[in-house]
């Protein structure tokens, strides 16, 4: 008889399922508790109350769709808006900080994908503790940089509001008025969205692993 973890592996055809259960063929109480953890109403499972489609084909969750939209559409638009703001106003500090923060996000994702590929092939965890903390510093620094740049450019005397006010003083028939207001508003929205997006990425990366460490009481870098 073959053994695995001190449990005999028997042919399923030789097992009397009714005899293994309790009364009327029911499972023992301990097995019922074990199997209940796989139910769809588990409070601690994030997808427990998600609406599952009737078909059995794999589908993307809303988080995956939002990530793809942010990664492929939103962040490139932030880069374009920052570049247009620099080209129109000549102010380079805030656009450079926003562009650096967005590029840092892409670099960290590329590094995580590369480490995941290399370490999984070596049967290791994707991240080591030093790499995890290094990525936390990079992502947290990028988020802080984007926030400071957005706040400074928005509320400085010669910043975003100054350009909006100056644009509103132009004649309504002047085509530069609408162009200047559009670029300024788009750049302002892009800067604050970039700051919020960077902070969301940092907290999502850090808190998930911090919570896992607190639950398992062991450093698990994944």
UniProtKB/Swiss-Prot annotation:
GO cellular component entries: host cell endosome membrane; host cell Golgi membrane; host cell nuclear membrane; host cell plasma membrane; membrane; virion component
Locations listed in the record: Virion; Host cell membrane; Host endosome membrane; Host Golgi apparatus membrane
Highest taxon above the source species: Viruses
Membrane topology: Multi-pass membrane protein
Transmembrane spans: 64-84, 98-118, 131-151, 182-202
Keywords assigned by UniProt, alphabetized: Host cell membrane, Host endosome, Host Golgi apparatus, Host membrane, Host nucleus, Membrane, Transmembrane, Transmembrane helix, Virion
GO biological process, any: viral life cycle
Quaternary state and interactors: Interacts with gK (via N-terminus); this interaction plays a role in the coordinate transport of UL20 and gK to the trans-Golgi network (TGN), and is required for their cell surface expression. Interacts with gB.
Described purpose of this protein according to its UniProt entry: Plays an essential role in egress of virus particles from the nucleus, cytoplasmic envelopment and virus-induced cell fusion. Forms a functional protein complex with gK and this interaction is absolutely essential for their coordinate intracellular transport, gK glycosylation, expression on host cell surface, and function. Together, they modulate gB-mediated virus-induced cell fusion and virion egress and therefore actively participate in these processes.
Family from the record: Belongs to the alphaherpesvirinae UL20 family.
Protein name, per record: Protein UL20
Source species: Human herpesvirus 2 (strain HG52)
Gene of this entry: UL20
